[in-house]
């Protein structure tokens, strides 16, 4: 009897070791095998360019800001492509709108000139529209598609000069200019907010590529649909990353449904959760999480918010819990502490822990800012949650707590400076790496004490950052939106190992497997490896 128990123990340990090694040799989900941005067995090159250490580079269909996931010899991506098919009546509605606009122009009162308004619109100021294209041409000096602090200040100065010239000559025109300037950051016209509801159909696909050559293996269409709302100008309709265990690929297209594919691209089941209503039509972006046979899906929105646990085998809901949260874009993280497997989720009102097997709320801890995007990272002791929209906050929360942990000894340490808006943190070698806002300003802290190791270090050549940092073999990779990629030494001191440049705009987080670094750009997918 004892021999059988010992034999079973050794078999269990062997299978655990094999499974752990297998997962470590893949990048199965958004933030890697341990959901912390680290590739345990990775070692891609530190130096590369368009002409150096590019194993392959391929054109991508449609759009998507989701991260590639890699399993064995396959790379999987999601894409949303316009089909060219318009919604019924959309062209007629456009024609009617044009006729109405022409009629209004003809009825303009005599003596009321449109010359000033036209000039203002051409300059990107005033009127009822905000000419973002012209604004970016004039003020986005580094060409990263985003305005940094200096560029925004230059834009504000230009606004003041424009308004000063108009003031006193035509108060009503000036008032329209002020309203028009503010509306540029709203949601109705795209601008800095969300976009209009599209009138064109999209094709939502899962695509498999050969890892060594970049050749397309297969393409599976999940659905075609006209999305019910718009999205942020830098976002898109394929922003949630897939997740795989080597048996199935789980894909969330949000309001277009949750899908379970086999490894050949065949849909085994799909589930509809209705239409999500996001703040300012910013769009959807939370990725599904997979733990054994349970899928965890976050559904934080402006209407009723929920978190779901779904059976991977059949798509049936295991449990569903209401969340007192508005729109959020973080991805749930699953961890086991002292035998209890729990789901950790960031939120503007609280960080929460749910027991995986039944959805029971174990603990919560408030303090985060609004619009939470960064996902939580965990080690054996703490969960590290942060946010950086209209404020800054990071908290190291001890695992194993119970109830409301706000302001208790269960919060190991906090900080309120330099935290990210979009990029998630990197947790590596007892250090947590993160960026300030969406900018190339780096901070690093010791996870045990919260002590600042690197504070507000500006990364030369990088201004805007959406991608989350990753690390492998003692190297940290930080990808800028303008195609600049800086490689740092994974240490407590700031040391640049290499500065690289690619001819692409990057919003997606990188993936690392073995000696390969995968970078999804606006138009291309790169595989970086030593030649």
Where are these regions (language model features)?
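Bacterial N-terminal signal peptides that target proteins for export
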Residues: 1-10
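Bacterial N-terminal signal peptides
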Residues: 10-21
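Noncatalytic, solvent-exposed loop/strand surfaces
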Residues: 23-150, 154-531
């Amino acid at each position: 009897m004892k021999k059988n128990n010992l034999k079973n123990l050794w078999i269990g340990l062997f299978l655990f070791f094999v499974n752990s090694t297998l997962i470590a040799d893949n990048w199965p989900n958004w933030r890697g095998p341990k959901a912390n941005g680290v590739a345990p067995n990775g070692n891609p090159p530190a130096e590369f360019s368009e002409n150096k250490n590019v194993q392959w580079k391929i054109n991508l269909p449609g759009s998507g800001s989701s991260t590639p996931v890699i399993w064995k010899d396959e790379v999987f991506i999601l894409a949303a492509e316009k089909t060219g098919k318009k919604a019924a009546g959309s062209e007629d509605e456009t024609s009617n709108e044009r006729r109405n606009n022409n009629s209004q122009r003809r009825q303009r009162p005599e003596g009321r000139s449109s010359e000033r308004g036209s000039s203002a619109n051409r300059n990107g100021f005033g009127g009822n529209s905000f000419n973002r294209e012209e604004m970016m041409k004039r003020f986005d000096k580094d060409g990263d598609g985003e305005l940094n602090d200096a560029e925004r200040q230059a834009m504000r100065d230009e606004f003041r000069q424009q308004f000063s010239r108009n003031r006193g000559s035509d108060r009503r025109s000036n008032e329209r200019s002020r309203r028009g300037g503010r509306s540029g950051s709203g949601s109705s016209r795209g601008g800095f907010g969300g976009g209009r509801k599209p009138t064109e159909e999209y094709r939502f696909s899962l695509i498999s590529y050969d890892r060594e050559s970049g050749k397309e293996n297969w393409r599976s269409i999940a659905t075609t649909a006209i999305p019910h709302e718009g999205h942020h100008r830098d976002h898109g309709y394929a922003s949630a990353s897939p997740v795989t265990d080597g048996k199935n690929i789980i894909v969330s297209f949000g309001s277009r449904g949750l899908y379970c594919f086999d490894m050949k691209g065949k849909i085994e089941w799909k589930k509809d959760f209705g239409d999500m209503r996001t703040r300012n039509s910013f769009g959807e972006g939370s990725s599904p999480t997979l733990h054994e046979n349970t899928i965890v899906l976050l559904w934080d929105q402006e209407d009723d918010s929920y978190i779901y646990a779904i059976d991977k085998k059949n798509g049936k809901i295991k449990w569903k819990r209401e969340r007192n949260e508005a729109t959020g874009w973080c991805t749930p993280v699953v961890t086991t502490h002292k035998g209890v497997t729990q789901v950790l989720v960031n939120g503007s009102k609280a960080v929460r822990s749910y027991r995986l097997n039944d959805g029971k709320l174990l603990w919560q801890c408030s303090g985060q800012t609004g619009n939470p995007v960064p996902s939580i990272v965990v080690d054996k002791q703490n969960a590290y949650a942060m946010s950086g929209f209209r404020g800054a906050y990071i908290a190291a929360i001890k695992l194993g707590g119970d109830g409301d942990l706000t302001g208790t000894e269960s919060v190991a340490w906090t900080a309120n400076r330099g935290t990210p808006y979009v990029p998630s943190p990197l947790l590596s070698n007892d250090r947590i790496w993160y960026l300030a806002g969406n900018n190339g300003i780096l901070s690093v802290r010791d996870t045990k004490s919260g002590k600042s190791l690197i504070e507000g270090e500006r990364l030369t050549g990088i201004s805007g950052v959406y991608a989350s940092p990753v690390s492998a073999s003692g190297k940290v990779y930080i990808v800028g939106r303008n195609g600049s990629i800086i490689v740092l030494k994974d240490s407590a001191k700031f040391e640049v190992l290499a500065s690289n440049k690619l001819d692409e705009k990057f919003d997606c987080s990188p993936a690392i497997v073995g000696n390969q670094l995968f970078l999804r750009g606006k138009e291309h997918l790169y595989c970086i490896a030593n030649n």
